[in-house]
Amino acid sequence: MEALVYTFLLIGTLVVIFFAIFFRDPPRIVKK
């Protein structure tokens, strides 16, 4: 059960970092 919690926290941290970088530096691939 603890492993599931740690995995959830790890994925959540990675997602937060990903979105922080994504919104800070707009992707050059998608041009609107």
From Swiss-Prot:
Q: What's the protein called, per UniProt?
A: Photosystem II reaction center protein T
Query: Which InterPro entries does its entry note?
Result: PSII_PsbT, PSII_PsbT_sf
The signal sequence is none
Q: What's the stated role of this polypeptide?
A: Found at the monomer-monomer interface of the photosystem II (PS II) dimer, plays a role in assembly and dimerization of PSII. PSII is a light-driven water plastoquinone oxidoreductase, using light energy to abstract electrons from H(2)O, generating a proton gradient subsequently used for ATP formation.
Source taxon at top rank: Eukaryota
Recorded family membership: Belongs to the PsbT family.
Which HAMAP family does its entry note?
PSII_PsbT
Q: Which membrane topology term applies here?
A: Single-pass membrane protein
What biological-process GO terms show up in the record? photosynthesis
Quaternary structure (record): PSII is composed of 1 copy each of membrane proteins PsbA, PsbB, PsbC, PsbD, PsbE, PsbF, PsbH, PsbI, PsbJ, PsbK, PsbL, PsbM, PsbT, PsbX, PsbY, PsbZ, Psb30/Ycf12, at least 3 peripheral proteins of the oxygen-evolving complex and a large number of cofactors. It forms dimeric complexes.
Q: Which residues cross the membrane?
A: 3-23
Under the cellular component aspect of Gene Ontology, which terms does the record hold? chloroplast thylakoid membrane; photosystem II reaction center
What does the UniProt keyword field contain?
Chloroplast, Membrane, Photosynthesis, Photosystem II, Plastid, Thylakoid, Transmembrane, Transmembrane helix
Q: Which Pfam families match?
A: PsbT (PF01405)
List where this protein forms a coiled coil: none
Classify the main location: plastid
Q: What is its subcellular localisation?
A: Plastid, Chloroplast thylakoid membrane
